[in-house]
Amino acid sequence: MSDVIQIRVDLNRPNFKLYCDLVLPGRGITILYGPSGSGKTTLLRCVAGLESSFKGRIAIGQDIWHDSEQKQISPVWQRPIGYVFQEASLFEHLSVEQNLHFGLKRSPSKHPLEHSIELLGIGALLERRPESLSGGERQRVAIAPALATDP
């Protein structure tokens, strides 16, 4: 993705206001940082499509993901983005391997899951159940499907 990323979010809630107007490169690494409660997670939820009750526009090159004026909102599953929640939610009744495959059912990938498993060093965890994983292991398992979707 070499296109420019345009993000304009204007969100007003009773105890929270977020206004952000950014133009970011479509390649490389961008870091979003700030104090607790400043809106980092909310902004990422807007980009991912998990929050849609805001005024503004999100576009990746010519692809418009959200435009409140035009009433155009792309569904979450149509956005090529990897999103990993702060709390790694895994299905406790499934093995790690089953959790990984479940997370990819709706998103055909160009990159095989095996590459993510190797990259994150979780191959030895595949037969284990989530309740036996440490917090860091759970997080790496949650990251693997996001990487495999080629975000």
Describe the predicted segments one by one.
Residues 33-35:
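The feature captures the beta-strand-to-loop junction immediately N-terminal to the Walker
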